[in-house]
């Protein structure tokens, strides 16, 4: 009903034309609006009118300009950070302890026997070469060298060579176990020209690793080393990796250090704990690792007091005598503090603890809480990262290290067709070993030194929004003390507890004491909050509008109303004008003035 | 409006414009800027202004209410002023933001030094005398002997070796054993002479540390050679400290006279120091290290110094991808008196930074693997006016003696060196030479030590003004280090490791290495997260203005327009009114003097009163003179603004056309 009435009124208005002009409307608006400027325009004399008109325009444009700035500020999503420091009851960090050596030598000796003999012989060769004339080939002295008994199968896969550079133009490459002497046909090649300059004046002889691809053309690269020690270590790691890759997981776990052998004593606060409180995890770098307070199956432990008395105290035995001699030259325990339910990446974030010492570690949890998209480019749980997290098999949370390793493993599978032993396997892929994939070392070596591949992984992985760093204050002291009574006193009970034997099997080279505790200030949290919220934006917009013109949202609505009125007038005017045009046109058919009645009558009569 | 020439004719027979004016004045309420009195103007202002309080004052009935409103309005004004002042004062505050970015990181420069500066075997000839003297001193003090005879060699023996100067120097500043601090007597340890101590100043511990028995006190005395009564005596609670300080003093004197090339030759070469080097999975060697001569640590080597224009980057975290070096520190060739610890010193720094290894170095133990994990943090502060820091150091009046970018430490050292050159005439050995100066030595500057010690004391007590001149730099890079140690080589790998490393070293020395001569060092990025802590201005002009606007709007609904209005009304209009009234008074006074006859009251006031009583202005929004002419308000003033305008009434046929038919005529002139 109302609608109909309304339309009728609209129609009437259309027919009658607008009741007022643009000027009237404008004047009325100026007089009645709540913004401050326009009123002055119509109230003042011509000079002031002009000034006020100009001022109003200026202020209006200022308002719009500043609004623009405010809105762009808002859309930049800046954040403000707040820092808090103090002590509070916090989750005790998960503590991963490993042995630097992944396996017990006594248990893997049968696997490594061939390789060790080979290494021994190669070392002999290298050391012999010292006094020889370098240009002459190393003679295979059959009476001395054990090469007949050696199985050169492993050697031939990845041989070590000696590069003689006494003549820098023609380096002579000598395979340690072969008599054939290849000239400079194969170019010693290294991926980083910044680091290695082939024409060396410092060392005349260097050891290099020969990595060959047998797939396509026999294509070999030589990985140069300035130090023979480094070369032998790297070579041994490659070879042993290939050997261990073939062994199924449950057997490798057997070969490592068992929890009861490694963790001798444990005390958390005042409560005793034992190796049973540790979650075992198989870490490819370090063999069996044990994680305290991982929070997987049970609730995480809290610590509500600072100081060593309330922290974790451990006594470990690393049995250094059982280390694999060529694989790890560094002896000690590897440990790392990390978040609950996260995978320990010991190579990146771990620290060493030295045998024969007591290591005290005061912990400060340095946390950075960030806001996700659009404030920062970080990921909350890794679900939006295009890399499949292979560490999901450990049921751990996303971390940047996990992403990078997964990315590398994916690339490894893509280029080499097999997975690297140090990283988890994607589905349906097996670990690389020299028998099934003879090219893998070549392939791995080139992939590892490729900058492009690394950059790809850096670009695809995102850091987590909550970044926790455990800041450690490490101090060390000799332990057990030299006083022999005390050492005996420590040694015997611990040995007895472990082996039920009266003979002391522990020695200073093996045992480590660890104290891990919260510092007096145990957290430092930097948290982000949005610097510009919508409330901030509105109040700033209001402030600007108010400051220049005393306006508010209602003023904007008023203005909108006037514009509608304007349009309405225009519509009416156009419709009237159209009507007028029609009439004119209708009139235009008769060029003369319309005939008067008399004329009509006349015409009629004339007819 | 009326053309200007009409105004000139008003004195004489009524021009038509004048007539009109008079007529208008009679009928119209004359208010606004043209109001005749200031109070009229104020009234008009209060009624018409857009601010809220003022109108209430005028409109309210009753004195109390008026008073309250005046109070409220004034307090609102006060609040606005206060709050705006607060806003302005807090304009220069900074907010801190922390961003973390995961990216390829530049590897820092790593400077490695042997703790022992020079090979003792090479230094021996320069130091033989000093060492002999020191040994003797130790023997005398502690009855310690090296199995040699305790017989002191006499001075003549030294002189025959042809180094008169040094022995003279040693005689000049001998070690003293203080027999009685109160009687001020001391024995020269070497010669056994008793002597009286003239100096009054006792330093280094006498005030802070309680020294047990005064008989045990050892020290030395520095005197101003020109004035032997002006002496400073340095005593130490421990003879070891005293001897070391004393040894260092003489050592620096001797070193200052040796030319740089010779010193470099006496130090360790890069091949000596570095056994193996491995970075990011690739071998490196001594050529990747840039030599750098440190006055106290001899030859140091900087990895990745960026000297050849490229700075290495790390694109993977973890120990395998960092810098791994095995250092060879030749323990047997150490100077027994100068350094008492064994190992190397390293510092992680930016390529542009000077490595202050003596101040902030990390020591590396031998027979150990030291693994250093790094986190990278970059920070930037805002400079003036937010905080007192310097961006480039160019605004600091201290010349940078180091060839590196500015830092606070560089400034302090440079400042001290400058003061040293100004006061003592020569430069201190541990810092670089300013242009035109030379290092202090006893030959040329016999009193430099005394001067140096005095100056250094002043410097420490902040009397030199260096601490005031030097500002911290605004941006800095920091590598947080986590250092941990492990045994290396492990007992089972020791054998082959040492054999192969000896083979590596074969060009230099032909012997089996000992593990106490070796140190393994790994420096790596723990993760590639770069933390960037930066200060940003918390305010800018836009935000300040919107805060102003918020304050003005909150308390008074005021705006910039109101402020201009206030300026207009209170300053321009009131001023003009006051002036006008002055002018009229003057005119009246002039007219009165000219014609003392009583005259009509001045015309101006009358119409104003009339205007007020005019029935037209029952409306609260009084039309002004101008608006009245042009745009009269509708007559039904009871609700002047509310309904949409009755547009037909806005025609110019308003009230005055019939009353003033001659207005139009006058204008059409």
From Swiss-Prot, chain A:
Substrates-to-products reaction catalysed: Na(+)(in) = Na(+)(out)
Cytoplasmic face of the membrane: 1-50, 573-607
Pfam families the record matches: ASC
Disulfides per UniProt: 98-289, 212-220, 266-273, 378-465, 403-461, 407-457, 416-443, 418-432
Ranges facing Extracellular side: 72-551
Localization terms from the record: Apical cell membrane; Cytoplasmic vesicle membrane
Entry keyword set: Cell membrane, Cytoplasmic vesicle, Disulfide bond, Ion channel, Ion transport, Membrane, Sodium, Sodium channel, Sodium transport, Transmembrane, Transmembrane helix, Transport
Subunit-level organization: Component of the heterotrimeric epithelial sodium channel (ENaC) composed of an alpha/SCNN1A, a beta/SCNN1B and a gamma/SCNN1G subunit.
Family, per entry: Belongs to the amiloride-sensitive sodium channel (TC 1.A.6) family. SCNN1B subfamily.
UniProt name for this protein: Epithelial sodium channel subunit beta
Source species of the chain: Pelodiscus sinensis (Chinese softshell turtle)
Swiss-Prot record, chain B:
KW Membrane (keyword) present: yes
Record-level Gene Ontology MF annotations: ligand-gated sodium channel activity; WW domain binding
Chain ranges on the Cytoplasmic side, renumbered to this chain: 1-67, 573-669
Activity regulation field: Originally identified and characterized by its inhibition by the diuretic drug amiloride.
Gene3D superfamilies according to UniProt: Acid-sensing ion channels like domains
InterPro entries: ENaC, ENaC_chordates, ENaC_CS
Record-level GO cellular component terms: apical plasma membrane; external side of plasma membrane; extracellular exosome; nucleoplasm; sodium channel complex
Region: Disordered, residue numbers: 592-619
UniProt topological domain (Extracellular) ranges: 89-551
GO biological process: cellular response to acidic pH; cellular response to aldosterone; intracellular sodium ion homeostasis; multicellular organismal-level water homeostasis; sodium ion import across plasma membrane; sodium ion transmembrane transport
Keywords: Cell membrane, Disulfide bond, Ion channel, Ion transport, Membrane, Sodium, Sodium channel, Sodium transport, Transmembrane, Transmembrane helix, Transport
Domain of life according to the entry: Eukaryota
Annotated membrane topology: Multi-pass membrane protein
Recorded catalytic activity of this chain's protein: Na(+)(in) = Na(+)(out)
Pfam families assigned: ASC (PF00858)
Disulfide bond sites: 113-300, 223-231, 277-284, 389-474, 411-470, 415-466, 424-451, 426-440
Subcellular location: Apical cell membrane
Self-association state and partner proteins as the record states: Component of the heterotrimeric epithelial sodium channel (ENaC) composed of an alpha/SCNN1A, a beta/SCNN1B and a gamma/SCNN1G subunit.
NCBIfam families referenced in this protein's UniProt entry, alphabetically: ENaC
Protein role: This is one of the three pore-forming subunits of the heterotrimeric epithelial sodium channel (ENaC), a critical regulator of sodium balance and fluid homeostasis. ENaC operates in epithelial tissues, where it mediates the electrodiffusion of sodium ions from extracellular fluid through the apical membrane of cells, with water following osmotically.
Family: Belongs to the amiloride-sensitive sodium channel (TC 1.A.6) family. SCNN1G subfamily.
Protein name per Swiss-Prot or TrEMBL: Epithelial sodium channel subunit gamma
The gene coding this protein: SCNN1G
């Amino acid at each position: 009903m109302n609608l109909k009435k309304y339309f009728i009124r609209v129609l009437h208005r259309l027919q009658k034309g607008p009741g007022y002009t643009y000027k009237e409307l404008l004047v009325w608006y100026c007089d009645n609006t709540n913004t401050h400027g326009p009123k002055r325009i119509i109230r003042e004399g011509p000079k002031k009118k002009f000034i006020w008109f100009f001022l109003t325009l200026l202020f209006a444009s200022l308002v719009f300009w500043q609004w623009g700035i405010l809105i762009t500020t808002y859309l930049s999503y800046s954040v403000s950070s707040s820092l808090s420091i103090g002590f509070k009851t916090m989750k005790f960090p998960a503590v991963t302890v490993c042995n630097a050596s992944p396996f017990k030598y006594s248990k893997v000796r049968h696997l490594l026997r061939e390789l060790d003999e080979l290494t021994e012989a190669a070392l002999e060769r290298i050391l012999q070469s010292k006094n020889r004339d370098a240009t002459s080939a190393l003679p295979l002295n059959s009476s001395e060298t054990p090469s007949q008994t050696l199985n050169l199968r492993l050697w031939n896969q990845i041989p070590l060579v000696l590069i003689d550079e006494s003549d820098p133009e023609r380096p002579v490459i000598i395979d340690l176990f072969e008599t054939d002497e290849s000239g400079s046909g194969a170019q010693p090649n290294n991926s980083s020209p910044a680091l290695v300059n082939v024409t060396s004046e410092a060392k005349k002889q260097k050891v290099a690793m020969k990595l060959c691809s047998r797939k396509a053309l026999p294509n070999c690269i030589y990985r140069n080393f300035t130090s023979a020690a480094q070369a032998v270590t790297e070579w041994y790691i490659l070879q042993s990796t290939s050997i261990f890759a073939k062994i199924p997981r449950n057997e490798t776990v057997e070969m490592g250090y068992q929890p009861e052998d490694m963790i001798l004593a444990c005390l958390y606060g005042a409560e005793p704990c034992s190796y049973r409180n540790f979650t075992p995890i198989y870490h490819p770098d370090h063999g069996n690792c044990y994680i305290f307070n991982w929070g997987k199956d049970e609730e995480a432990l809290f610590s509500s007091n600072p100081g060593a008395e309330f922290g974790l105290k451990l006594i470990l035995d690393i049995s250094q005598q059982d280390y694999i001699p060529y694989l790890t030259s560094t002896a000690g325990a590897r440990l790392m503090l990390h978040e609950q339910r996260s995978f320990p990446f010991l190579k990146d974030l771990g620290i060493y603890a030295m045998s024969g010492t007591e290591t005290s570690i005061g912990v400060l949890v340095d946390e950075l809480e960030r806001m996700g998209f659009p404030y920062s480019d970080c990921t909350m749980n890794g679900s939006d990262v295009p890399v499949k997290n292979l560490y999901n098999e450990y049921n751990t949370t996303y971390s940047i290290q996990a992403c990078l390793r997964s990315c590398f493993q994916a690339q490894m599978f893509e280029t080499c067709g097999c997975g690297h032993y140090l990283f988890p396997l994607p589905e349906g892929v097996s670990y690389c070993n020299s028998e099934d994939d003879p090219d893998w070392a070549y392939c791995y070596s080139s992939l590892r030194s490729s900058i492009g591949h690394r950059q790809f992984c850096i670009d695809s992985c995102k850091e987590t929004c909550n970044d926790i760093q455990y800041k450690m204050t490490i101090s060390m002291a000799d332990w057990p003390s030299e006083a022999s009574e005390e050492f005996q006193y420590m040694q015997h009970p611990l040995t007895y507890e472990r082996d039920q034997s009266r003979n002391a099997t522990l020695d200073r080279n093996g045992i480590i004491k660890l104290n891990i505790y919260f510092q007096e200030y145990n957290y430092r949290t930097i948290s982000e909050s949005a610097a510009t919220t919508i409330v901030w934006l509105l109040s700033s917009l209001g402030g600007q509008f108010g400051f220049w013109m005393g306006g508010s949202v209602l003023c904007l609505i008023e203005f909108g109303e006037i514009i509608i009125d304007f349009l309405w007038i225009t519509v009416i005017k156009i419709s009237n004008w159209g009507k007028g045009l029609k009439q004119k046109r209708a009139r235009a058919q008769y060029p003369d003035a319309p005939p008067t009645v008399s004329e009509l009558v006349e015409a009629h009569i004339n007819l | 409006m009326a053309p200007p020439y009409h105004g000139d004719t008003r004195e004489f027979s009524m021009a038509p414009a004048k007539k009109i004016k008079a007529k208008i004045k009679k009928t119209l309420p004359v208010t606004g800027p043209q109001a005749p009195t200031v109070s009229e103007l104020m009234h008009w202002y209060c009624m018409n202004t857009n601010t809220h309080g003022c109108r209430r004052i005028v409109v309210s009935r009753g004195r109390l209410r008026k008073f309250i409103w005046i109070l409220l309005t004034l307090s609102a004004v006060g609040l606005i002023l206060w709050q705006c002042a607060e806003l302005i004062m807090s304009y220069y505050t900074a907010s801190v933001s922390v961003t973390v970015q995961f990216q390829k990181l530049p590897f820092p420069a790593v400077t490695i030094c042997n703790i022992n500066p020079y090979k003792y075997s090479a230094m021996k000839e320069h130091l033989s005398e000093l060492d002999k003297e020191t040994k003797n001193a130790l023997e005398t003090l502690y009855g310690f002997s090296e199995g040699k005879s305790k017989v002191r060699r006499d001075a003549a023996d030294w002189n025959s070796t042809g180094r008169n100067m040094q022995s003279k120097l040693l005689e000049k500043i001998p070690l003293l054993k203080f027999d009685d601090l109160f009687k001020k007597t001391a024995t020269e340890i070497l010669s056994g002479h008793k002597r009286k101590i003239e100096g009054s100043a006792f330093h280094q511990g006498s005030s802070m540390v309680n020294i047990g028995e005064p008989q045990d006190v050892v020290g030395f005395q520095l005197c101003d050679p020109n004035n032997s009564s002006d002496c400073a005596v340095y005593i130490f609670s421990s003879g070891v400290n005293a001897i070391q300080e004393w040894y260092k003093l003489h050592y620096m004197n001797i070193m200052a006279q040796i030319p740089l090339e010779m010193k470099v030759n006496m130090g360790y070469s890069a091949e000596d120091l570095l056994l193996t080097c491995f970075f990011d999975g690739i071998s490196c060697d001594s050529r990747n290290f840039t030599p750098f001569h440190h006055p106290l640590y001899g030859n140091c080597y900087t990895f990745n110094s960026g000297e050849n224009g490229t700075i290495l980057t790390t694109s993977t975290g973890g120990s395998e991808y960092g810098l791994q070096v095995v250092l060879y520190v030749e323990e047997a060739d150490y100077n027994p008196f100068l350094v008492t610890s064994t190992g190397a010193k390293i510092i992680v720094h930016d390529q542009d930074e000077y490595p202050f290894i003596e101040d902030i170095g990390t020591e590396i133990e031998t027979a150990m693997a030291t693994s250093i994990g790094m986190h990278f943090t970059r920070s930037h502060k805002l400079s003036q006016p937010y905080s007192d820091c310097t961006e480039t150091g160019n605004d600091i009046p201290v010349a940078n003696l180091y060839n590196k970018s500015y830092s606070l430490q560089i400034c302090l050292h440079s400042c001290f060196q400058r003061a040293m050159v100004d006061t003592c005439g020569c430069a201190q050995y541990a810092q670089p030479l300013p242009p035109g100066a030379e290092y202090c030595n006893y030959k040329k500057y016999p009193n430099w030590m005394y001067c140096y010690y005095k100056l250094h004391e002043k410097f420490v007590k902040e009397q030199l003004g260096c601490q005031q001149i030097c500002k911290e730099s605004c941006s800095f890079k920091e590598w947080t280090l986590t250092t941990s140690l492990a045994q290396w080589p492990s007992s089972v790998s020791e054998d082959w490791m040492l054999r192969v490393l000896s083979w590596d070293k074969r060009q230099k020395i032909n012997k089996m290495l000992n593990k106490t001569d070796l140190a393994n060092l790994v420096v790596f990025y723990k993760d590639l997260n770069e933390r960037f802590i930066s200060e940003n201005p918390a305010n800018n002009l836009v935000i300040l203005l919107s805060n102003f606007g918020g304050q003005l709007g909150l308390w008074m609904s005021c705006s910039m327009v109101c402020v201009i209005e206030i300026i207009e009304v209170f300053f321009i209009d009131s001023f003009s009114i006051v002036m006008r009234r002055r002018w009229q008074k003057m005119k009246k006074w002039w007219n009165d003097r000219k014609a003392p006859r009583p005259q009509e009251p001045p015309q101006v006031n009358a119409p104003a009163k009339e205007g007020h009583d005019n029935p037209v202005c029952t409306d609260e929004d009084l039309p002004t003179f101008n608006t009245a002419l042009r745009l009269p308000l509708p007559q039904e003033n009871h609700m002047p603004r509310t309904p949409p305008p009755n547009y037909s009434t806005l025609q110019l046929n308003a009230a005055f056309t019939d009353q003033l038919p001659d207005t139009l005529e006058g204008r059409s002139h």
